[in-house]
Curated annotation (Swiss-Prot):
Source organism (scientific name): Trimeresurus stejnegeri (Chinese green tree viper)
UniProt signal peptide: none
Similarity field: Belongs to the phospholipase A2 family. Group II subfamily. K49 sub-subfamily.
Gene Ontology BP term (one): negative regulation of T cell proliferation
Protein name: Basic phospholipase A2 homolog CTs-K49b
SMART domains, per database record: PA2c (SM00085)
Disulfide bonding pattern of the chain: 26-115, 28-44, 43-95, 49-122, 50-88, 75-86
Taxonomy, superkingdom: Eukaryota
Main location: secreted
Function, as annotated: Snake venom phospholipase A2 homolog that lacks catalytic activity. It shows myotoxic and weak anticoagulant activities. A model of myotoxic mechanism has been proposed: an apo Lys49-PLA2 is activated by the entrance of a hydrophobic molecule (e.g. fatty acid) at the hydrophobic channel of the protein leading to a reorientation of a monomer.
Tissue expression pattern: Expressed by the venom gland.
Amino acid sequence: SVIELGKMIFQETGKNPATSYGLYGCNCGPGGRRKPKDATDRCCFLHKCCYKKLTDCDPIRDSYSYSWVNKAIVCGGDDPHLKEMCECDKAMAICFRENLDTYDKKKKITLKLSCKKTSEQC
């Protein structure tokens, strides 16, 4: 769910997920996939692609279990669909951490109207 995703992002980056990433670039937050503005925005693009492959779960409401072991996210639980969702969220949180050096505060709130459509496929 959004709650677990937020915790993962905070654990990996130390940033507030809602204010730092909620409307970042063209792909973070609600809406379809657009041409990414930078590496952080690409993390959100890839996350949407990952969610698109999910079946039998609702990424907004369904919750999964994970643990934080030696500063690493470990997805748990028996449900393969929820584990898959956890892996999508884990990948995005790690992607955000790996791209902290190019995070641009000016892109924290991007008007989606300024975003270009992309022909890039998942």
